[in-house]
From Swiss-Prot:
It is found in: Cytoplasm. CDD domains: IF2_eIF5B, IF2_mtIF2_II, mtIF2_IVc. Residues 159-168 have a biased composition (Polar residues). Residues 1-239 are annotated as: Disordered. It comes from Oenococcus oeni (strain ATCC BAA-331 / PSU-1). Disulfide bonds: none annotated. This is Translation initiation factor IF-2. The keyword Hydrolase does not apply. Residues 438-441 are annotated as: G4. Residues 363-367 are annotated as: G2. Residues 8-19, 207-221 have a biased composition (Basic residues). Residues 329-498 form the tr-type G domain. PROSITE patterns: G_TR_2 (PS51722). One of the essential components for the initiation of protein synthesis. Protects formylmethionyl-tRNA from spontaneous hydrolysis and promotes its binding to the 30S ribosomal subunits. Also involved in the hydrolysis of GTP during the formation of the 70S ribosomal complex.
Amino acid sequence: MTEEEKKRRPLVHHIRKQSASKSELPASQRRHAAGLSSRAQGERHGEKTPTNNQDSRQRRRVSFDSNTGRPAPKDHKPIHAGSASAPAGSSLNQPRKTTSQRQRTNSRTSKTTVEPLRRAHPHNPLPNQHPVTNQRNNRRNNNRTAGGQSSNNRNNNNHKTNASQNGTGRFGGALASGNNSARNNTRRRNQTTTAPGTHFVSGPARGIRRKSGPKGSKKAQRIAAAAVSKNRQNERKEQPLPKVLEYRLGMNVQDIAKIIHRDVTEILKKLFLLGVVVNQNQSLDADTIELLAADYNIEAKQKEEVDVSDIDRFFDKTDNDIDQSKLVSRAPIVTIMGHVDHGKTTLLDYLRHTHVTEGEAGGITQRIGAYQARLHDRLITFLDTPGHEAFTEMRARGANVTDITILVVAADDGIMPQTIEAIHHAQAAKTPIIVAINKIDIPGVDPNNVINELMKYDLVPEEYGGSTIEVPISAKTGQNVDKLLEMILLQADMMDLKSDPTAKSRGSVIEARLDKGRGAVATLLIQQGTLKTGDPIVVGNTFGRVRTMNDASHKKLDSALPATPVEITGLNEVPQAGDHFVVMDSEKDAREAGESRAKKAMEEERNNGAVVTLDTLFSTMAKRDMKTVSLIVKADVQGSVEALSASLKKIKVEGVRVDILHAAVGAINESDINLAEASGAIIIGFNVRPVGQAKTDAEQKHVDVRLYNVIYDAINEVEAAMKGQLEPVYKEKTLGTVSVRELFHFSKIGTIAGGLVTDGIITSDSKVRLVRDGVVVYDGQLGSLKHGKDDVKEVKKGFELGLTIANYNDEKVGDVIEAYTMEEVKANA
């Protein structure tokens, strides 16, 4: 037994005597005594009781290196006090210190211990000062002190002797005074202080200090941000001031700072010295902005307030508003017009050396096609417009954007209704007309007949002293087509067509559609400027940025010059065909203009709604009494939507009207099916098909979906459906009369009237009218008809019969029964 154990043994014996009665000792000392007793018993049997440090390490199943404080390998053996492997002079071979000695030592070394710990690298700590060891020891000392403080509060007067005796034992600090607690807490805070931006990690690797964030401490981030801000301020100061400060009302200090390249703080200081106290977000008036500009010795000029939504102002510019020095020659824009099937597309097909006509439904053009052809290294832009009467608006659009109109007239047909309409459109647009008399390859045709007819519409040929160029051609064989192109270039040279490629690009929408994968797709014809990919653009009531741009042959373009037809994507919605487009300064301006135009259009549509007045009351009530055919129109392009909707509205059937609930570009989707189901509408699809779940939904919800690729078929079938909506008109037809002469009453059958057919014929399915003294008593259906005892289908004049009237048993002798039927009168088509 060692000397330390001998010293400890009397204390154990003393505690055993004191614990004979449990009520004599406090709970804290009973726990202490139990711990000492178990320890002494273990040592008496040769068992070595581990210390507190060893207990914690065994519980965690991790051994630590005493020199570094890190987790040691599995084969590492800890060094215990008194072992041969303990280094000389280490704390493990030193005699155990009393509590007062430890406190004096800690108070002397606390200041010198903290500084090396702060400077120590987390992976290479100073000897005997590793964070793990210090943290663990301080935690144990603090717990001992806390236990001693609570014990002294209860037993301050009775156990001072025991506290001094236990000072050198295992629980030496357990009964120390409360003053030690404050010192231990202070020492614990000092020793566990770590460098900024680090923290201790719990677990076996506790004590390894790591960075708290990927970018270091917040202080370093603040310093870096301040440095960047200072660099930006210096860069602004290095930039020269503008000569003129162009401002608009409502600008704030931030807006002014961006224009004159100065810091916001600097401007606020100047305004404060000038007697103006504002913040950076407060709007400045014109006087304040001019005062600030004068302080910077620059001129202030207010911008004119321009309505960004008024894009039509760009098309109202005269020759005086255009810089003539920047104008260059451009390709002529030629529109091919004429009656249906007169050979417009065939002519263009020959020019392009493609076969467009064969691929078009019904062999007719149903949308505007924009293409380019080359002759003698010069480009000509062609627009092919439909000739059917339904496409009046599309022909008008083609005439409004064109330089020259090619009027195609078939030599065998002559002047037709759409030919006359095309002439009027071209004359209204004030464009020169070149007449192409087509189909001269047909035997027996005479082009002079066409020339004589055209003179009635002020189209006088040059040989008769007029200015109209006329060229007989054959689009099928190509005869005289080159001569026609030469006439086009000659006319273009006479017109001296020029444009400014450096101006803001503007033009018109030829066609628009909704593509499933690409979104809104618009075919544009550039009239001024150069359109580039990425330009912010306003198209009618829509806006966006040019995402992609292709030419007529689907080749991708980065830029397009005037008179070039292009197909673009990137718009937020499908625009209307015929709308103008303009490139804006920024996407913000484009968005503002597009949204403003859309809002105005919505307000105009709302204001143009039908208002019922005394003057229109009768017609409004008449419309409400009419049968309605509700339609939903979906087509592939905007021009087809307009043409089909206008044609359907023109169908006139007395008593029935067309109500188009919805007309849009794109495939038939689930929303269209739901709308049709709710409103009982018929869906008309033109060159489109149901997509996704729409087809299945239409079958399940019994929605009528009609699909067409020729406009004639759509119009004819809708007209037939409208005629079918009329209520049939019936006319009464008298069949015969019966004079009642005798009555037979049966309990199960009722009253049977016996009589004689005095006129006509009585059938078993006829309606009957009971007349008594010239007054109709009952009008209903014949119940049964008998001749003798047999049921018969009819009884002719002069024969007796027996009959019953359904739901009526009050016949009397002398009544007259009239038999009649209702026949439907066919409505006139």
